Design a protein with these regions (language model features):
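Short, glycine/acidic-rich hinge or "gate" loops at secondary-structure transitions
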Residues: 45-48, 163-184, 494-505, 581-589
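Short, solvent-exposed loop/turn and secondary-structure capping segments
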Residues: 45-49, 107-109, 116-121, 225-227, ...
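Conserved redox-cofactor binding core of oxidoreductases
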Residues: 60-62, 68, 72-74, 85-92, ...
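Glycine-rich loop(s) and the adjacent beta-strand/alpha-helix scaffold that form part
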Residues: 26-29, 33, 40-56, 266, ...
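Beta1/beta-strand and adjacent pyrophosphate-binding region of the FAD-binding site
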Residues: 5-19
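A glycine-rich dinucleotide-binding beta-alpha-beta segment and adjacent secondary-structure elements
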Residues: 216-219, 238-239, 278-283, 429-440, ...
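FAD cofactor-binding and catalytic pocket of flavoenzymes
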Residues: 78-95, 99-102, 106, 110-126, ...
């Protein structure tokens, strides 16, 4: 079949989630002709908006808005001596698909990392003596300062209508917020969400024990909000269907609610769904791209010429597309040469579930980000060097959903039949959780590459993930177990269960952790150790920009979306202010 060549555009955007929609609208506002290609289908709000009922089985069990492994499987192994096997069912992580991507079904915790997280290598060099940390750890600084990136955090938070309590306003510490956060130029756009009973209980005990709890920063908006693009987001009504669901009430910031409503009305923007990009096509000099090849909904292979190519798919698939396209040298863990695939990182979770016969937490009345957390156990805020590990966690009590199938039940409760129904009737609404979301460092032998054995439905190699837990992350888990246990003891439940990784634990792909995968095409100052410069521009192909979690050199305890938004907006500004005037490398190697 002959290839169909499309009309050339200024910018082609591959993937229409948070990064893709933000890059599209910013460049379209600058007057560029922007064409977006989305592998999945359209996700118009009419598909799931009120009065249609939320469907727990469809969304939370059958993963209605997630990609299927048949479309985008990866292969996984613990180490390079093993043969990786493909994922047949999502477990530890679950990427989205279609317009909105993972930004449609996210929990909407919108939190910044700390300045120490941004300059983690600098902190390690100052605080850790040689020999304390594993010698295969590969920590890096982000290639920008807090002062450079902070305005873009605030811009993204205005786009989302971020709700929360300010803790550090231009260096002044304010009561009720996070005293460890980096200085903010402006307060949170909106006040925090209301607390649920578990939040009140957790806050009281955490404060008593000397910690500094504050409300979860949220992109489920607490008040009606009109953002800088002119989009209106409705106040959250605490419906209880949030994490893994599109918002039925138009109250959760997503690409649909915060960006697409305005973007779709722009005459210089267009998008095509069910369009799977399979390769970035390079010019003969291999220093510039001339467009992308994709398969359309009818099965035709199409070529979309463009002056600028933006890869804005989910983190794993940005890395795969770079490898398939020959953009950047693939990483070799033996020689440590190459950059595409290195510094992959995930995260771990865990915590305690507490049961109280005499308390009703009314879990049906909640938002995804409803909760209290504290940041005392993050790098630089406690004595990690004396404990022999690097990293930390946000420790929180959140009530992200109140749906019955996901309800926690005491140990020994049957998982099916009459006993399950009786247990659900007895215990629904009588439990709360204390949870951890941890950092994860990058390592020499943890990486992504193309699998030599397994191909996708188009005959292209699957992405291969080589990943397992390291001693550093397991030491962190054990330290957090003691902290969470002390808080739980003070709360005095009737019974409880705890879940933490023991020393020696292997990565379990079957149990959900988070969709906070990062790294693989990281940003940095050195083209020998990073695939992208500070503006997410490929060091090797200067008209290719790659926004997303792939740019993180390691994972911090903060959820990644705020940073993905900020670095995307900073890159878009650099394209508008610098690249369009003088196309070429924005940072000299």
């Amino acid at each position: 079949m002959a290839q169909v060549t499309k009309k050339e555009v200024d910018v082609v955007v591959c993937g229409l989630g948070w990064a893709g929609s933000l890059m599209s609208i910013e460049l379209a506002l600058a007057g560029l002709d922007v064409r977006a290609l989305e592998r999945g289908g359209d996700r118009d709000y009419d598909e799931f908006a009120y009065p249609k009922p939320a469907d727990e089985y469809a969304y939370a069990v059958r993963n209605k808005v997630f990609a299927t492994p048949a479309e985008v499987a990866v292969t996984v192994r613990y180490n390079s001596s093993q043969t990786a096997l493909p994922t047949r069912k999502w477990g530890a992580f679950a990427p989205g698909t279609g317009v909105g991507g993972s930004g449609l079904h996210w929990t909407a915790v919108l939190i910044r990392p700390t300045p120490t997280d941004i300059k983690l290598k600098t902190y390690v060099d100052e605080a850790y003596k040689p020999g304390i940390l594993q010698d295969d750890m590969r920590v890096m600084d982000f290639p920008f300062s807090w002062e450079e990136i902070e305005p873009y955090y605030y811009k993204f938070e205005l786009i989302c209508g971020q709700s929360g309590n300010t803790g550090n306003l231009r260096g002044k510490i304010l009561e009720g917020g996070d005293p460890f956060e980096g200085p903010r130029s402006e307060p949170y756009p909106l006040p925090a969400l209301d607390d649920t009973l578990n939040n009140v209980m957790f806050k009281e005990v955490a404060t008593k024990l000397g910690y500094h709890p504050f409300p979860n920063p949220s992109a489920c908006v607490s008040r009606a909000w009109k953002n800088p693009y002119g989009n209106q987001i409705a106040p959250c009504n605490y419906c209880g269907y949030c994490s893994k669901y599109p918002c039925l009430n138009y109250s959760k910031a997503s690409p649909q609610t915060a960006v697409m409503d305005s973007l779709k009305r722009m005459p210089n923007f267009s998008y095509e769904v069910n369009a799977e990009v399979i390769k970035v096509v390079l010019n003969d000099d291999k220093k510039t791209a001339k467009g992308v090849s994709y398969i359309d909904a009818q099965g035709n292979e199409c070529f979309q010429p463009a002056k600028i190519v933006v890869l804005s798919s989910f983190q794993l698939y940005n890395v795969r597309l770079m490898l398939l396209s020959g953009i950047g040298k693939p990483y070799n863990p033996i020689t440590e040469e190459g950059v595409v695939g290195r510094n992959y990182a995930f995260l771990s979770n865990g915590g305690a579930t507490l049961f109280f016969k005499d308390k009703n937490f009314n879990p049906y009345a909640t938002a995804g980000a409803t909760g209290q957390m504290f940041n005392d156990i993050s790098p630089g805020n406690f004595d990690g060097p004396s404990l022999g590990f690097l990293g930390g966690a946000k420790i929180h009590s959140s009530q992200a959903t109140g749906t019955p199938i996901s309800t926690a039940l005491p140990k020994g409760t049957p998982t099916w039949g009459m006993g399950y129904k009786e247990g659900l009737e007895e215990w629904y609404g009588h439990s709360m959780k204390i949870s951890i979301t941890t950092t994860c460092q990058s390592y020499r032998d943890i990486y992504l590459d193309l699998d030599p054995n397994y191909n996708d439905h188009r005959g292209l190699p699957l992405l291969r993930m080589t990943f397992n837990w390291k001693e550093n992350e397991l030491k962190l888990q054990q330290h957090l177990k003691g902290i969470v246990g002390n808080i739980a003891k003070e709360l005095n439940p009737d019974s409880m269960s705890m879940s933490f990784l023991p020393m020696g634990a292997d990565f379990d792909l079957t149990k959900y952790v988070s969709t906070h995968n990062v790294g693989g095409a990281v940003m940095g100052d050195n083209p020998k150790t990073s695939a992208l410069n500070k503006y997410l521009q490929s060091w090797d192909v200067h008209n290719v920009f790659v926004p997303g979690g792939n740019a993180f050199p390691q994972n911090f305890q903060a959820n990644p979306t705020d940073t993905i938004g900020a670095i995307t907006l900073m890159a878009a500004q650099a394209i508008k202010d610098q690249y369009l005037k003088n196309p070429g490398p924005l940072v000299q190697a």
